[in-house]
Amino acid sequence: MIGIIGAMEEEVAILKDKIVNLEIINVAHVVFYKGRLHDKEVILTQSGIGKVNVAISTTLLINRFHPDLIINTGSAGALDKSLGVGDIIVSDMVAYHDADARAFGYQLGQIPQMPAQFVADSHLIELAKEAINDQKWVAKSGLIVSGDSFIGTAEQRADIKTNFPQAMAAEMEATAIAQTCYQFNLPFIITRAISDLADGDAGITFEAFLEKAAIASSQIVDRLIKTI
């Protein structure tokens, strides 16, 4: 079984409409959509926004449905200047940009007793790249950073780039999903479409281009599931 997680309704609606033999299951105020997509058994959920919401949803998904892997779909703000709205970013690793336990000898972004970064599954990365190349999307792979703030000012963006110069994009859930998968020893991949440029116009751009980003990220997941 393939687990699929998106934070917002727009990020899961397209995939939900493609699922056949759909069964809707409610667990602890989290809605799960179970069925088949490209003849693969899938379980899809809209987790809600932020690290705690998505950690709860991911844990419920894993404990209740026992997926073989997790795919995270959705949108992100670009931190790398080579990325534009509608482009695709595939994580090779993820990290928190808002965790700081350096007083105890940990790296910036590292949760105590956890890795500094969480590494995505290499096989899933290759499959995602193949799916992207088939459709000729503009895509990059690299570090995605997560935190419980929407990055909507130039100052926020500059702070993250200072602390994490390799970061390609920022969003609010991916690293919490990755940490949960790490705890359960489950492979994961993060695929995000760029909805904004994480700058002073990010709020306006996000609202305008969320649908475009949702379509692009859903298409990537759809193609990826075909190849798994």
Curated annotation (Swiss-Prot):
Annotated Gene Ontology cellular component terms: cytosol
Q: What reaction does this enzyme carry out catalytically?
A: S-adenosyl-L-homocysteine + H2O = S-(5-deoxy-D-ribos-5-yl)-L-homocysteine + adenine; S-methyl-5'-thioadenosine + H2O = 5-(methylsulfanyl)-D-ribose + adenine; 5'-deoxyadenosine + H2O = 5-deoxy-D-ribose + adenine
Which key words are in the record?
Answer: Amino-acid biosynthesis, Hydrolase, Methionine biosynthesis
What GO MF annotations does this protein's record show?
A: adenosylhomocysteine nucleosidase activity; methylthioadenosine nucleosidase activity
Keyword Amino-acid biosynthesis appears in the UniProt entry? yes
Q: What's the Enzyme Commission number for this chain?
A: 3.2.2.9
Q: Which domain of life is it from?
A: Bacteria
Binding residue positions for substrate: 77, 151, 172-173
Q: Pathway, according to UniProt? A: Amino-acid biosynthesis; L-methionine biosynthesis via salvage pathway; S-methyl-5-thio-alpha-D-ribose 1-phosphate from S-methyl-5'-thioadenosine (hydrolase route): step 1/2
Which terms does the UniProt entry file under GO BP? Answer: L-methionine salvage from methylthioadenosine; L-methionine salvage from S-adenosylmethionine; nucleoside catabolic process
Specify the enzyme's EC class, one word.
Answer: hydrolase
Active-site residues (renumbered): 11 (proton acceptor), 196 (proton donor)
Family to which the UniProt record says this protein belongs: Belongs to the PNP/UDP phosphorylase family. MtnN subfamily.
Q: What does this protein do?
A: Catalyzes the irreversible cleavage of the glycosidic bond in both 5'-methylthioadenosine (MTA) and S-adenosylhomocysteine (SAH/AdoHcy) to adenine and the corresponding thioribose, 5'-methylthioribose and S-ribosylhomocysteine, respectively. Also cleaves 5'-deoxyadenosine, a toxic by-product of radical S-adenosylmethionine (SAM) enzymes, into 5-deoxyribose and adenine.
Name listed for the protein in its UniProt record: 5'-methylthioadenosine/S-adenosylhomocysteine nucleosidase
Q: Which organism is it from?
A: Staphylococcus saprophyticus subsp. saprophyticus (strain ATCC 15305 / DSM 20229 / NCIMB 8711 / NCTC 7292 / S-41)
Give me the gene this protein comes from.
mtnN
